[in-house]
């Protein structure tokens, strides 16, 4: 009987010691958490706030003083296609070309093809060139923003196309010049966007 009592008391003592050790361990953890909490409370507060991305916030000033992001049209001085040596006289286009839906549709199809198949690599190229990596979300936003402007900008490009010998009677030549100008301006818009994007929008 005495042996049984001794064994029971010994086991009880071991259980109490185990519980006491567990309690001490928990107290240490609580103390550590309390210290960390106090440290966080004593740190200077910094509020980032809600970050919203809007292309309008990233507009840059163009040559004539207006704000523009996305697709930069010809400037008033026609400097967007310098390699084509375009002067400032407005082209008198053939009315049939100006109102022909197939003419407009052909240009729009080519520009959408460019945006779908080539624009992404152009953006990556400019990111590497400027050492400014972007998240995928912003790349897609750039392309989508340009797409939304295509149809509305096309008449402006047509009106700003400049006089070349034979261009007013050659719709294919006019089409090629407009497409070249639009592609060049799209690339300039991508580059300008990347150069002016705030640091907190850049990919870490």
From Swiss-Prot:
tRNA processing as UniProt keyword: no
GO terms for biological process, alphabetical: sporulation resulting in formation of a cellular spore
UniProt-listed Pfam families: GerPC
Induction: Expression is sigma K-dependent and negatively regulated by GerE.
Keywords: Germination, Sporulation
Function comment: Required for the formation of functionally normal spores. Could be involved in the establishment of normal spore coat structure and/or permeability, which allows the access of germinants to their receptor.
Protein's name in the database: Probable spore germination protein GerPC
Species: Bacillus cereus
